[in-house]
Amino acid sequence: MEKIFKILANLKFAIALLLLISITITFGSIIEQDQTLDYYKQNYPLTNPIGGFLTWKVINMFQLNHIYKNFWFISLLLSLGISLIACTFFQQFPGIKFSRRCYFSNNPRKTDFQTQLKTNLSRNIIYTIISEGYFVFQQKKNFYGTKGIIGRIAPVFVHLSIILILLGSIFASLGGFNSQELIGKGEIFHIQNVTSSGPLTKLSQQAIRVNDFWINYYPNNKIKQFYSNLSIINGDGQEVRSKTISVNKPLIYKDLTFYQTDWNLLGLRISHNNKNFQIPVIQTTQNLNKVWLTWLPLESNTSKNLSGETIIINNYKGTIYIYDNNGQLNKKIELSNFIENKNYKLIEFLSVTGIQIKSDPGILFIYFGFGFLMVSTILSYLSFSQVWLGIDYLEQNNIKLTVNAKTNRTKVLLTTQMYKITKNKR
């Protein structure tokens, strides 16, 4: 078992896993995820494979249509996590243990700086080394000093940070979900239209109410921003939280995040002889802008002389344009105004707001993991330096002081530092 863990702790094995994960993520970025089988049959046909091999059968066989949720991708993440844990225990911890040990020696090997000097100022040299931030220990006539032990400990936290990120990714793949809802103003809804989910996903039964929806426009009638005011409703029907969301400003409640994504117009509410009725609209586009069309009948459908007016809506400002049967603009009507002979009154635009709801149980692991990763990566670049001093007593009260030093980084800086400490103490 120990041999297996040593193989897992091998750097080449970890790099190979990282390479496989990177290639897999690349495929996940190129191939559209969580689409229907017909979509892949249409875009990845057997007759003209992309790259000479990528067809819908290959995608379906290797589950490339939902890469981040399939078993072999999660297995790669788990393998990398186990490799990092093994590396931490078999390589990092022994190195830390060695670094914390007081390693006294008269002649250490492979040093970056070495000098001998006759001086009566050995005490001053030791004090100077301590003032440079070294922790100095004494054993009889030998001294040992270390500096930057955090640089040896930080790689352990780098590994732990990556493990946190991997755990967060696995939790998100297994238990997260994504839902798209189109909800009318004033309606209460539950999460239903789930577009993607993991095998261990548990859908929330949280009730949400859309209190209002509105749009801000630029002076040229281009949409500036659209907003939805949402309320979180508890089991007793009481509002526990409310917030106005917009694009890039979501509502976060417990493990749910509500994003503003889209909007649409469903119809118009018209009043006729003190009775309200609704007429649907058809959406089309004109110069890449949304336009809605509808037809308002002015007489009964059973009448032989059926007449009506065509209505066009091109924004959500509350204005409609009425055209006659010849396609000529008849009039422009605002909300609460009459359309025809004071019998038909425009009451309301019937709109829906697009809300994307996401649940990611691993998001905290990922955030903390990246936070620790940034800090620990910076700390891991700190040099770990060691200094050895050996004292030999000579005749006439003279002292021969042997100074050795080495570091794992910034070797030139260490050599310069030791030279400055010793040059005036001869």
Swiss-Prot record:
Presence of keyword Transport: no
Membrane listed as a keyword: yes
Major site of localization recorded for this protein: plastid
Gene Ontology BP terms: cytochrome complex assembly
Keywords of the record: Chloroplast, Cytochrome c-type biogenesis, Membrane, Plastid, Thylakoid, Transmembrane, Transmembrane helix
InterPro entries: Cyt_c_bgen_Ccs1/CcsB/ResB (IPR023494), ResB-like_domain (IPR007816)
Membrane topology field: Multi-pass membrane protein
Transmembrane segments: 11-31, 70-90, 153-173
Localisation: Plastid, Chloroplast thylakoid membrane
Gene Ontology CC entries for this record: chloroplast thylakoid membrane
Cited HAMAP family: CytC_Ccs1
Subunit structure comment from the entry: May interact with CcsA.
Annotated function: Required during biogenesis of c-type cytochromes (cytochrome c6 and cytochrome f) at the step of heme attachment.
Family of the protein in this entry: Belongs to the Ccs1/CcsB family.
Descriptive protein name: Cytochrome c biogenesis protein Ccs1
